[in-house]
Amino acid sequence: MDQQAKPVSIVMIEDDEGHARLIEKNIRRAGVNNEIIPFSNGTAALNYLLGADGSGIVSSGKQLLILLDLNLPDMTGIDILEKLKSNVHTKRSPIVVLTTTDDSREIQRCYDFGANVYITKLVNYEGFANAIRQLGLFFSVMQVPEAQ
């Protein structure tokens, strides 16, 4: 992610510590050196992205890429997706859903709420690691808009 103005920050919302380490390690292996800001629950992530008042003004001017697990301990990833995509300050931030759920209705719901990419976590370690490396290569060439 080669940006002239501000570097893109990757916000990773993933409650499984093993998955979070695997995701970060393989994004790094793909040559992506952007800051990764990890959260293990939706409440802390939304507080960071939307602020304590929920207005989202705290994200204004930032370039954010969000990696979102759907199965979190305190709320669903769908709730987070809906809040971020309906907020004027975060609606343009790309959201990549990374989850174990491969239910076609759930996939459709995520796209309906504005997910940009939906990736099913493979049970097989090597397959999942390879998918994340490929995602990292995608990150290295994509453009991310600045939040309003």
Regions found by a protein language model. Name each.
Residues R92-D102:
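A short, hydrophobic beta-strand element within the central beta-sheet of small alpha/beta folds
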Residues N116:
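Short, glycine/charged-rich "phosphate-handling" switch motifs in NTP-dependent
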Residues G56-G61, K85-R92, F113:
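Conserved phosphotransfer cores of two-component systems
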Residues M1-V11, D16-I37, N41-L46, L50, ...:
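Non-catalytic signal-transmission and effector/linker regions of two-component phosphorelay proteins
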Residues L68-D69, T99:
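Active-site residues of response regulator receiver
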Residues P73, D103:
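The feature encodes the CheY-like receiver
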Residues K121:
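A Lys-centered signature of the CheY-like receiver
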